[in-house]
Amino acid sequence: MAAAAGRLLWSSVARHASAISRSISASTVLRPVASRRTCLTDILWSASAQGKSAFSTSSSFHTPAVTQHAPYFKGTAVVNGEFKELSLDDFKGKYLVLFFYPLDFTFVCPTEIVAFSDKANEFHDVNCEVVAVSVDSHFSHLAWINTPRKNGGLGHMNITLLSDITKQISRDYGVLLESAGIALRGLFIIDPNGVVKHLSVNDLPVGRSVEETLRLVKAFQFVETHGEVCPANWTPESPTIKPSPTASKEYFEKVHQ
């Protein structure tokens, strides 16, 4: 019975994926090259919004967990306009913000990447590197970087763009939409020992907050350094809590006068 149900499920998924593939193929025949990526994105977002089962992620096979070691990764990246082999080991002793985005030459993605790049120095000031990952090739990354921002490109980058053309990194981090072949907007904060401190995943149409990511990095570092915990909406200028029943009253008396 279970085997028959499994075959029926996979048959349904295959039919759905095949229908999407035919739709994409038909559109690319009829449309010019410049509009093909738009067509693909529209189809994927529409299906994702409808919650179709064909757009299941790989998270059922492997999901990174907070407090656990981050999955190892290795790939070719664009760093300061050059190609470089990069791995998780390169970030030992540093914090790492690893964030995934769907595709190069799209719409929300450049706003996120440019925003992180513009804040790169603030991340560096707290011993944190930022790496953006998509399933595009490193050649595509470089072409996008060489495209002016006013034309939807990235321009000069102060952060690294990593290629996941095999989709293995996205799969290992549990953010790959398997049948669509692209990653959701997953973001992982990894500490200097390679341990995941935070993870979040957005659906395709909504971008993330760079300021909130930086705030979280600073909060985790504060806890490690001072042994106190950070309340809601904490910033480096705001009070923290001593984690004990008696000592914590100092904080609560201060904020609830």
UniProtKB/Swiss-Prot annotation:
Post-translational modification here is noted as: Phosphorylated by LRRK2; phosphorylation reduces perodixase activity. The enzyme can be inactivated by further oxidation of the cysteine sulfenic acid (C(P)-SOH) to sulphinic acid (C(P)-SO2H) and sulphonic acid (C(P)-SO3H) instead of its condensation to a disulfide bond.
Q: Give a Gene Ontology cellular component term annotated to this protein.
A: nucleoplasm
Q: Which residues form the active site?
A: 109 (cysteine sulfenic acid (-soh) intermediate)
State the organism of origin.
Mus musculus (Mouse)
The EC number(s) this enzyme carries? 1.11.1.24
Q: Which residues carry this modification: Phosphothreonine?
A: 147
- When this gene is knocked out, what is seen? Accelerates decline of physical strength; at the age of 10 months, the physical strength is much lower than in the wild-type littermate. Increased oxidative damage and decreased mitochondrial DNA copy number in skeletal muscles. Increased apoptotic cells in the brain.
Tissue specificity here reads: Housekeeping-type gene preferentially expressed in murine erythroleukemia (MEL) cells.
Which Gene Ontology molecular function entries are recorded, alphabetically? cysteine-type endopeptidase inhibitor activity involved in apoptotic process; identical protein binding; protein kinase binding; thioredoxin peroxidase activity
Q: What is the catalytic activity of this protein?
A: a hydroperoxide + [thioredoxin]-dithiol = an alcohol + [thioredoxin]-disulfide + H2O
Modified residues annotated as N6-acetyllysine in this record: 92
Q: Which PANTHER family match?
A: THIOREDOXIN PEROXIDASE (PTHR10681), THIOREDOXIN-DEPENDENT PEROXIDE REDUCTASE, MITOCHONDRIAL (PTHR10681:SF128)
InterPro entries documented for this protein: AhpC/TSA, Peroxiredoxin, Peroxiredoxin_C, Thioredoxin-like_sf, Thioredoxin_domain
User: Thioredoxin domain: which residues?
Assistant: 64-222
Q: What is the lineage of its organism?
A: Eukaryota, Metazoa, Chordata, Craniata, Vertebrata
The reply on keyword Metal-binding is no
Q: GO biological process annotations for this chain's record?
A: cellular response to reactive oxygen species; hydrogen peroxide catabolic process; maternal placenta development; mitochondrion organization; myeloid cell differentiation; negative regulation of apoptotic process; positive regulation of cell population proliferation; regulation of mitochondrial membrane potential
Q: Does the keyword Mitochondrion apply?
A: yes
Q: How does it assemble?
A: Homodimer; disulfide-linked, upon oxidation. 6 homodimers assemble to form a ring-like dodecamer. Interacts with NEK6. Interacts with LRRK2. Interacts with MAP3K13. Interacts with RPS6KC1 (via PX domain).
Family, as annotated = Belongs to the peroxiredoxin family. AhpC/Prx1 subfamily.
Induction per UniProt is: Expression is increased after induction of MEL cells to differentiation by DMSO.
Modified residue annotations for N6-succinyllysine: 84, 92
| Protein name, as recorded | Thioredoxin-dependent peroxide reductase, mitochondrial
Q: Which domain of life is it from?
A: Eukaryota
Q: What else is known?
A: The active site is a conserved redox-active cysteine residue, the peroxidatic cysteine (C(P)), which makes the nucleophilic attack on the peroxide substrate. The peroxide oxidizes the C(P)-SH to cysteine sulfenic acid (C(P)-SOH), which then reacts with another cysteine residue, the resolving cysteine (C(R)), to form a disulfide bridge. The disulfide is subsequently reduced by an appropriate electron donor to complete the catalytic cycle. In this typical 2-Cys peroxiredoxin, C(R) is provided by the other dimeric subunit to form an intersubunit disulfide.
- Extract the transit peptide range from the record: 1-62
